[in-house]
């Protein structure tokens, strides 16, 4: 990576029957600006015939400039030796890539990863695990370094393609975070750190992402997902894998993508917003099983609905194959619609810019849009980036300057834009395979900078931004949060620069914040919404010892 240093080790074989090589000189050079070789000359007294020499104990030390461009860089190793009346002189050319890839990545799957990754502390050790599925039908759980986590449990083979992203929360309130994911084998799976908790057979293709919310009156959470068959059931599943009362609800519509959840009427229960791939509906389903049609479009929906609340107003957005992005109220009145010029597969993602909410989405004509809640364009947008845009945007403040960036993968390019539409340094980043999932932005290795993690047609890719950034309260992953509810709320924050772990909002994460979290846990004291958010470092909606471990680890490292 730019700014890194590394050791370069060579293995030099002197083949038999050639004689021993005496007085061997090694000279490593590079003509590239930004590459500094600290010890470019080495001397070897002798390399015996039929033996191999290596410079493990004296490697070439190389420093890469922080300002170097990403790309391939050439080195030349000259080997010069003499033996009695014979001499040997040969140049060997090698190329070393300078990339922004995180150590341990790309993680090769040999199959497409449409599942947007999830990062949670699954095993309560203060470190994040990365969870995703692939087209080979495997559910992967990786440690932060890209190695497989608990190979006795994962990867878990479902036997059929996985298009779904995982969702996570402590569904059964047992103190352990759970995650759920669906497979095209018609099953919904629930796991915790100990392995499989339930296997729900929907008897319908499940290709959308499950969402976790509160659908009934008990304390535990429920999982909601739609089926992709002609009957198009909406399923609500309890923590033990049984059906919630009044579910499944048959709406006779195929559901291609995930649902959105929110409690619109303040009764403590979430309503379900679905989009359909048949009669082209945006519909609302409540816990009683009743279905209300909010909008009928002119063509199918293959994007998830997204919900934003600004002030007292709700806006539901979804893109259609009739080339429009629709924005409606919670009761179905049209707020605005955008003529996108081509099919809209991309779901809306939201960002708050100084109290003004903007929705980002793409269309198949290669335009990436950013509009306010009246349908007006953000200055500098739309951006034409080419290729069909099937994925959605994620946001984070990559460089810690207080302003977010927008990230998305399209074809074989990973983009990061400033809010004025200009590109972030080093971006777009090319990759050999097309990017096929919405990116997750997280500090998975907890080194203070952020990683952009996304699925591709053959691997899971993680790009290390290498600047001190923050995800804050941004829409930084598929569907906006770990529970995949597709809901975003703009509220006046008592903290002007929100930062996970900075409970007292002094722009520092330190022992004072640890003490505040400890006090909250021990005394169950009342805290503000911001303090609750900043204390919940693993974003599992529970403030507990796991959050203390994570904040202590952040401070130490």
For the regions a protein language model found, what residue spans apply to each?
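Terminal connector regions
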Residues: 60-96
